[in-house]
Structure formats: structure tokens, C-alpha cells
């Protein structure tokens, strides 16, 4: 097929803009065929113009369904492909079940608006993985009921990104919250976390402030600004 004759399978539009693109294969083919096809389309310049708005790709052969964030053809990497899991950690490979869980309204809207991050430093779009999304949703539900709890993560599972989005979403979703405070238990992580949060916030709608000392922390807590504050337990204890 000539490059000019390419025809996309399915594109989902939000407010008139193409945001989610789906490539479908039959069961005799691997879902990865869809990945390589998308990579080829990007290299051919098919996702330009209005289609440059696409933020999420979905690939499926009917029985295996995956998703990943948009990137250039040279940056598109299979390691960023993720399958969907329900909140009990059960895989959701079937394309219809995936569509019901992820691509309905408002789930598709939330995936794009609430669970996508533009990493300013890496110059890369990030789509959160299912366990991160379920953790953030659990935090939101607990906050509505005035409850607290723990979210357990392992090394390399994206704890900082999960923490940023959880803190950010609480601040954006609940008008009565004036300050969202991210508390760190080790001083050496203060600067590191603040820099990561700022990298995520540079293209977001929230202000992230790092506190250099106790005096500055008190000043920020008393201010009328709605903001996200990164600080340490040590500063609060003084």
C-alpha cells in the first residue's frame, strides 16, 4: 500500500480533536503488529496537522489489548506499552472489556485530562499505568469520606509520578482544598522530589512550591494562594 493510501482504523475525538487512536488486528496477528504499524505511520508523517493532537494509542487483536502514549517514531518504545488491570489487579485483555473500562465517557476523558503528564525534562508524554490510576482514585474516594490510608509501591514503580498526580488532582478537584502538601520523610529527597514535581507542573495548571526553611513554610501555609507545597516532616516538627 502506498503511503498516501494509508487509512486509520478508529480515532476517538474529544471536543472535536482526535485524542485516542486505535489500531485493530485480527486474532491471527499479534497486537504488536499494530504497534509497528503506528510507528510506521508516525515515520511517514501521518500524525501531523490535526492528528498531532493524538495523545494515546490503543492496539488490539481482539484478545490482547494494550495502550501507550504518543511519541515520535524514534522515541516510540515497546517498553512503554501497558495492558489494563482492574482495581483487583486482574488483566483486562479483551478489546470490548478494555473499551468499557478505559474508552467510555468519562473514562476516556479522564485518561487524557487527569492521567497524562508531559515530562518537561524528558520532553516526553507519559500515560499513567493502571495501578497508578487505581491508587489515585482510591486516594480521591478516601478523601471524600475523610479517611486516610497507605499506598504501597515498589522501587521503580513510579511513586513520585503517582504522588504528583494524586496531590494535583485533589487540589484541582476539591474547591475547599486551599493547599495540597506533599510531605517527605527524608531531607535528601526534598530537592529531588521538588524538581520532579516542577518538571511535571511546568505544563500543568498547578503551582508547585518548595520550602527552603521553616519560616518560608509558615509563610506559604498562611498565604491565600491555592498551591501544592513540597516539604519535609522535619520542617513541620519545628
Question: Which functions belong to the PLM regions below?
Answer:
Residues 213-229:
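Conserved motor-coupling elements within RecA-like helicase/translocase cores
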Residues 189, 210-217, 236-237:
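Short acidic loop-to-helix transition motifs that present clustered carboxylates
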Residues 1-179, 188, 192-203, 224-228, ...:
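ATP-dependent helicase/translocase motor core
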Residues 185:
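Conserved H-loop
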Residues 203-210:
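Acidic/polar loop patches that form or flank catalytic/metal-binding clefts of enzymes
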Amino acid at each position: 500500500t502506498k503511503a498516501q493510501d494509508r487509512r486509520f482504523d478508529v480515532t476517538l475525538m474529544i471536543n472535536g480533536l482526535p485524542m485516542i487512536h486505535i489500531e485493530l488486528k485480527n486474532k491471527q496477528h499479534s497486537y504488536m503488529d499494530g504497534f509497528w504499524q503506528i510507528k510506521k505511520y508516525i515515520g511517514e508523517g501521518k500524525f501531523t496537522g490535526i492528528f498531532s493532537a493524538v495523545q494515546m494509542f490503543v492496539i488490539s487483536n481482539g484478545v490482547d489489548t494494550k495502550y501507550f502514549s504518543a511519541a515520535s517514531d524514534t522515541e516510540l518504545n515497546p517498553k512503554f506499552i501497558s495492558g489494563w488491570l482492574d482495581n483487583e489487579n486482574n488483566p483486562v485483555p479483551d478489546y470490548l472489556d478494555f473499551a468499557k473500562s478505559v474508552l467510555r465517557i468519562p473514562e476516556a476523558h479522564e485518561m487524557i485530562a487527569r492521567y497524562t503528564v508531559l515530562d518537561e525534562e524528558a520532553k516526553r508524554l507519559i500515560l499513567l499505568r493502571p495501578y497508578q490510576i487505581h491508587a489515585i482514585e482510591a486516594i480521591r474516594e478516601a478523601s471524600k469520606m475523610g479517611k486516610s490510608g497507605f499506598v504501597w509501591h515498589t522501587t521503580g514503580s513510579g511513586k513520585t509520578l503517582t504522588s504528583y498526580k494524586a496531590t494535583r488532582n485533589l487540589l484541582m478537584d476539591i474547591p475547599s482544598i486551599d493547599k495540597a502538601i506533599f510531605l517527605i520523610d527524608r531531607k535528601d529527597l526534598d530537592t529531588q522530589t521538588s524538581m520532579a514535581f516542577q518538571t511535571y507542573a511546568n505544563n500543568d495548571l498547578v503551582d508547585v512550591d518548595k520550602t527552603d526553611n521553616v519560616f518560608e513554610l509558615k509563610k506559604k501555609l498562611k498565604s491565600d494562594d491555592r498551591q501544592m507545597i513540597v516539604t519535609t516532616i522535619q520542617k513541620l516538627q519545628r
